[in-house]
Amino acid sequence: MRPERPRPRGSAPGPMETPPWDPARNDSLPPTLTPAVPPYVKLGLTVVYTVFYALLFVFIYVQLWLVLRYRHKRLSYQSVFLFLCLFWASLRTVLFSFYFKDFVAANSLSPFVFWLLYCFPVCLQFFTLTLMNLYFTQVIFKAKSKYSPELLKYRLPLYLASLFISLVFLLVNLTCAVLVKTGNWERKVIVSVRVAINDTLFVLCAVSLSICLYKISKMSLANIYLESKGSSVCQVTAIGVTVILLYTSRACYNLFILSFSQNKSVHSFDYDWYNVSDQADLKNQLGDAGYVLFGVVLFVWELLPTTLVVYFFRVRNPTKDLTNPGMVPSHGFSPRSYFFDNPRRYDSDDDLAWNIAPQGLQGGFAPDYYDWGQQTNSFLAQAGTLQDSTLDPDKPSLG
């Protein structure tokens, strides 16, 4: 039997041979194609993401129902925070529910629906960050209003400034999304402008919030006020610092990638931070690896800080402290007078130091009904009268 001579290197392959893959040819395919993520992993992650957001949605919905159940003030910092977080959780739940049925259709929605599901939740998170700045700034104002009542006149400008910043953030996102979808503008330029403006506002709000937390930690009256709300400086500082670090790290990452996007050695995620809608539109489909990173980033940079905010503004039973045997009877408040409960709120006599209710104190927090000075002075006056009557039987009693 004659040995088969080797085929020349340039000859055509035989009928049973697989042609070698030539990466220079567009019509050639690699020998094997495997998905970046197995389908069952992607389905499992979709289930986990959807369940987490759905549970948060149910929890916030229960909190809003408790606001009505306990007859708290309906329009308050607490209710607005919870409503924003409820809207955010609902949008994220709907977004991930799309991936159960059609992975491609979730990235090819109509322009408005696409912006609503992908970009608008970040706007809602910025609104919550702005509202946290407004909340803690008012804590400082109310703590200082006893000695500096003129600070209360700055509340209206503070409201207007917060509203203006929120509107700027919303309009920038909406305008850039419309230009990307309908205009002939350079998408990279639009994305860069939006990222630069949005992340700068995020960083500025985070810096402002850190300054507020620092001032609160140095003010004893602010500590008393937070104790009356069922919170404490340590709790406020821990939650605030965590939220600041998460939002700031997200913004700094995006600004870093934006600044060094021309550097080929710098590798970013499979998409531009919260401009996921633009990046997915350019690719027409979010890849498997990009989908995993998308869920992880949303979990760390969105779900975690939102959960902390919801925990801080959760609704508690206002009647729980009324049965506390250590509470002074004359300090009894209406069940509608607060939405933070703290069994230790009157353990210290230092709480009586804030015995003058500043003007306008009832209008800022939910629901505020603090006549600390009147109730304290009334209690002390009655106690003094009873003591005098006991020591001097001939002295007529005023009661």
UniProtKB/Swiss-Prot annotation:
Keywords: Autophagy, Glycoprotein, Lysosome, Membrane, Transmembrane, Transmembrane helix. Residues 68-79, 133-159, 210-237, 314-399 are cytoplasmic. GO terms for biological process: autophagy; negative regulation of bone resorption; negative regulation of osteoclast differentiation; positive regulation of protein localization to lysosome; positive regulation of TORC1 signaling; regulation of autophagy; regulation of GTPase activity; regulation of macrophage activation. Expressed in kidney, heart, brain and placenta. Its main location: membrane. The chain crosses the membrane at residues 47-67, 80-100, 112-132, 160-180, 189-209, 238-258, 293-313. Residues 1-22 are annotated as: Disordered. It is a multi-pass membrane protein. Residues 1-46, 101-111, 181-188, 259-292 are lumenal. It is found in: Lysosome membrane. GO terms for cellular component: lysosomal membrane; membrane; plasma membrane. Glycans are attached at residues 26, 263, 275. Interaction with RRAGA; increases RRAGA recruitment to lysosomes. Interacts with MTOR; this interaction is amino acid sensitive. Belongs to the GPR137 family. PANTHER family: INTEGRAL MEMBRANE PROTEIN GPR137, INTEGRAL MEMBRANE PROTEIN GPR137B. Lysosomal integral membrane protein that regulates the localization and activity of mTORC1, a signaling complex promoting cell growth in response to growth factors, energy levels, and amino acids. Interacts with Rag GTPases and increases the lysosomial localization and activity of Rag GTPases and thereby regulates mTORC1 translocation and activity in lysosome. Involved in the regulation of lysosomal morphology and autophagy. This is Integral membrane protein GPR137B. It comes from Homo sapiens. The gene is GPR137B.
